[in-house]
Amino acid sequence: MMNGNGCGEAVTSSLTWSVGLLNGAHKYLTAETFGFKVNANGAALKKKQLWSLEPCVDAGEEAVRLRSHLGRYLAVDQFGNVTCDAEEHGPGAIFQITVSADAKGQWALRNTNRGYFLGASSDQLVCVAKAPGPSELWTVHLAARPQVTIRSIGRRRYAHLSATGDEIQVDAATPWGEDTLFTLEFRDGRYALHTANDRYLCPDGKLIENCAPECLFSLEFHSGYLALRDINLRYLSPIGSKAVMRTRSNSVTRDELFSLEDSVPQAAFVGFNGKYVSVKQGVDVTANQDEVSDHETFQLEWDKDTGRWFVRTMQDKYWTLESSSGIQANADKGSANCLFELNWQPDGSVTLVASNGKLVGAKKSGHLFANSEPGDPAAKFHFALVNRPVLVLRCDQGFVGRKGPSSPRLECNRASYEVVHVERADRGVCHLKGNNGKYWGIAEDGSVSVDSDDSCGFYVELREPSRLCLKTADGSYLNADKNGAFKAGAADPSQATLWEY
């Protein structure tokens, strides 16, 4: 029943996954916060159900350690007892992954020290089975943000939607724009690959509108990297001169391995003249374009020490403050002159503060200079998060999603996410739409429902690399309230909920 696939060449990696492990009774492996107790009775993937999957390359390319949210290692002692109280990993903390040979692709975890498989008896963990049965099979639930970029280990290139929008190609040197963003949808224990144009990947490389059973792939772990296997037990890889993503081989080599990387925010800015900021005409940063292309798309890279941002161009150069106070895109990363502070304004606009303390403003020619004072209309820009055509929102309580299949009201404590479609409008406004084709609307009590035929305007305010605020057109922030309530509340930005996206 079991099939262990090995790579042709071992891959050394320091990559660590954050996962949940779901047993046959649909319960999660759980590390309790008291007494370092461990069981299998978690109903949803929350903090206590998170495990860091650490590769152990020296013990084999499918060997891992499991570290709890408390920083303790899951281990099996000489008597077969399962523990999770050691801060340092010993020989009993290594497990070898084998993958079931059926389409489900579930994992069995064999303790290398004992030689037995980890299983669940009722809600208790045991390690006594010489061969894996139903109680020893685990479904892997990735706990990372579901929206990612995908990098091929063999090709050393990123996946992107083709120009015709009908296939995925793996030949991008850098992940630039919305076409390199993919959503991994967890469905029935497996994963579907959802593209930015709202299509699903089939094993033959075609993209279709609905998620058919053949669009589901099981997930495998190989030395910190990912492999995706279809229902016919063949693996996704880039094929041919166009590097089209499809399945072909029934074994794993470097060609079948991928890494999942967080998608860094990429934005466009519109000046007071209604033109997009661009580097199309050279190193001068100028607000003079009518449409968004790669030249008008800028990657925002967070500097944690200062709370400011580096602004990167498609040419791998950075905005910098010149001695003339002009802004040019000709610098390498690292200089303090390349850092800009984003300040969000009550009217939905944003100002950029340069290293000289002045606001960046656009001249009549469109050229950007950092010599403006607060209140100058030329220093206000409208912001668009261009590489997020869809959003998945999460807070400490859970994901944002509908209360139930028959209820349009949104809550923020859901165990699974719902994709939010983003429609960009003028002056930084965006409209948010659900999978039911209805728009988000705000009721008199501030609650949010997906039931409106008319679009309601929202502003996106980027606060951190993976966190944002959502503000209504009248200035109210969408906040997580107690008991999972999702409401438009106070206008004070310091009280606004930071949504992981």
Model-identified regions with their sequence ranges:
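Lectin-like carbohydrate-binding module/patch detector with strong preference for beta-trefoil
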Residues: 2-501
